[in-house]
C-alpha cells in the first residue's frame, strides 16, 4: 500500500468515527430500507457497449492530492448536465472532503440535475459508508482492492449488492486483479496510474485485460487524453472508460467528452 493511501485511510477512519457519532449506523440502516430503486449503473454501461458505443464514466472532481485544485469554477449540477448532453453513460462524483475537496452534497446536486447513474468516488472501507452511499442516492460504489483485505472486499461488495448498489472494484496490478475477480461484482477498473510513482501508462490496462473475466465490464481509468488513446483501447476490446481530469480542465466538460469519444465515430 502506498504512503498516500495509508495517509488517506487513516484520515478516513477518523472521518467514519465522527460521522457515525453524528448519525448512528442504525439510523442509516433504517433510512436505507425504504428507498427508490437505483438507476442501474452497470446496466447503463453494458447498454452503451451493446450498442457499439464507448461507455464513459465522466468524473466530477474539483481537486486531487497530486494536482491541487483542477477546476476552480466548480458547479456539479452544471457539469452533470453538460456530461449527459455530451454522451456520458454514467457519472463519478468525488465525495472525499479532506484530500479531494469533494462533498456528499456534490453527488446529490449532480444526480438531481441529470438522469445518469452516479458512482460515489470515495475510499470505502467500512459498512457504514455503504449504507451512507445508498442513503445519499449513489447508484454504485468504488472498492479499491489495495485498501482492503479479501474478507472486507467480499463483505462490502456483498452488502452493496444487497442494498441494490453496483460495485466498481479498482486494481493497479495483476495480483490485485486476481483478488478482485474472486468477488462477483459487475465492473472491474484497471487504474493506469502507479500509486507509488504516480506515473501513468495505458500499457497497464493492455497487459492485464486478458485476465478480466468476459462477464465483467473492464473499465480503463486514468491517462485517457486523446482520440488515439481511445482508439488504442477500443481496438484492443476495451470499451469502458473513466475520465476526469481531461474533462475538468476543459471550459465545457461535456463538449470535451463528445470530442474525445464521439466526434471521430
UniProtKB/Swiss-Prot annotation:
Entry EC number(s): 4.1.1.48
Catalytic reaction list: 1-(2-carboxyphenylamino)-1-deoxy-D-ribulose 5-phosphate + H(+) = (1S,2R)-1-C-(indol-3-yl)glycerol 3-phosphate + CO2 + H2O
A single GO molecular function term of this UniProt record: indole-3-glycerol-phosphate synthase activity
InterPro entries recorded: Aldolase_TIM (IPR013785), Indole-3-glycerol_P_synth (IPR045186), Indole-3-glycerol_P_synth_dom (IPR013798), Indole-3-GlycerolPSynthase_CS (IPR001468), RibuloseP-bd_barrel (IPR011060)
Enzyme class: lyase
Pfam families (UniProt xref): IGPS (PF00218)
Pathways involved: Amino-acid biosynthesis; L-tryptophan biosynthesis; L-tryptophan from chorismate: step 4/5
Keywords: Amino-acid biosynthesis, Aromatic amino acid biosynthesis, Decarboxylase, Lyase, Tryptophan biosynthesis
Keyword check for Amino-acid biosynthesis: yes
Gene3D superfamilies: Aldolase class I (3.20.20.70)
GO annotation (BP), single: L-tryptophan biosynthetic process
Matches recorded under NCBIfam families: PRK00278.1-2, PRK00278.1-6, PRK00278.2-4
Stated family: Belongs to the TrpC family.
Name assigned to this protein: Indole-3-glycerol phosphate synthase
Amino acid at each position: 500500500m502506498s504512503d498516500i493511501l495509508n495517509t488517506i485511510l487513516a484520515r478516513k477512519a477518523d472521518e467514519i468515527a465522527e460521522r457515525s457519532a453524528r448519525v448512528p449506523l442504525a439510523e442509516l440502516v433504517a433510512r436505507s430500507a425504504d428507498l427508490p430503486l437505483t438507476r442501474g449503473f452497470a446496466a447503463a454501461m453494458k447498454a452503451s457497449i451493446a450498442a457499439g458505443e464507448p461507455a464513459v464514466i465522466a468524473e466530477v472532481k474539483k481537486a486531487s492530492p497530486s494536482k491541487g485544485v483542477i477546476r476552480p469554477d466548480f458547479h456539479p449540477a452544471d457539469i452533470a448536465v453538460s456530461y449527459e448532453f455530451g454522451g456520458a453513460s454514467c457519472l463519478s462524483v468525488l465525495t472525499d472532503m479532506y484530500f479531494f475537496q469533494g462533498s456528499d452534497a456534490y453527488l446529490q446536486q449532480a444526480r438531481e440535475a441529470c438522469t445518469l447513474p452516479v458512482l460515489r468516488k470515495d475510499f470505502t472501507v467500512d459498512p457504514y459508508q455503504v449504507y451512507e452511499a445508498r442513503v445519499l442516492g449513489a447508484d454504485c460504489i468504488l472498492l479499491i482492492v489495495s485498501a482492503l483485505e479479501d474478507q472486507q472486499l467480499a463483505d462490502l461488495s456483498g452488502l452493496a449488492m444487497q442494498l441494490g448498489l453496483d460495485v466498481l472494484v479498482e486494481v493497479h496490478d495483476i495480483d490485485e486483479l486476481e483478488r478482485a475477480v474472486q468477488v462477483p461484482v459487475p465492473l472491474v477498473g484497471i487504474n493506469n496510474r502507479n500509486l507509488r510513482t504516480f506515473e501513468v501508462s495505458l500499457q497497464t490496462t493492455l497487459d492485464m485485460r486478458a485476465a478480466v473475466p468476459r462477464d465483467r465490464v473492464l473499465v480503463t481509468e486514468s491517462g485517457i487524453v486523446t482520440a488515439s488513446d481511445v482508439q488504442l483501447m477500443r481496438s484492443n476490446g476495451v470499451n469502458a472508460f473513466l475520465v476526469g481530469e481531461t474533462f475538468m480542465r476543459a471550459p465545457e466538460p461535456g463538449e470535451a467528452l463528445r470530442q474525445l469519444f464521439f466526434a471521430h465515430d
